Amino acid sequence: GSFTGLAAMTRSELTIRNVSFENLGIIPAQFARLGIRFEQHGDDIYIPQQEHYRIENFMDGSIMTIADAPWPGLTPDLLSVFLVVATQAKGSVLIHQKMFESRLFFVDKLIDMGAQIILCDPHRATVIGHDHQMRLRATRMTSPDIRAGVALLIAAMSAEGTSTIQNIEQIDRGYKDIDGRLNALGARITRVEE
């Protein structure tokens, strides 16, 4: 899920191999609701380069809601990635974190980067997408946890300029050698000692 979000945010083409597609549950369908196109090739997922992606609306035109739920629902660990991806989509979406407290308290960092997000309460945030018309701005930020950390990393990679993320140990706990893996894909990530 994180790499799918990264491909969308950076407008990159990406093939993710050996994803065990049958075990992804509704994750691919939720990305499709954000307008992210992908193709299943056996057990691989191919995400083509996309200049734009449009968030679906409900049939009556009302704003789409993406919410977490116990399996087979959407894993709460990906909500932060969906939130970041929505910042550059065309349209608006309500992200509803039902299962945990305080997981949306990283949105202030995205707002500092130029994202249009309204934090409704500790469980809900409305994202108004930029449709890639306004790039996020680089900034200095601190990773509060694994999920928010990788979402901030995705935001930083799509932003204009150089960002600094502190407390990267949080990201390392969930994503082994993330900088090496992303640099192999063309990213420019450097670890610095402070």
Please identify what each model-predicted range represents.
Residues 1-194:
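Short, structured segments at the rim of ligand-binding sites
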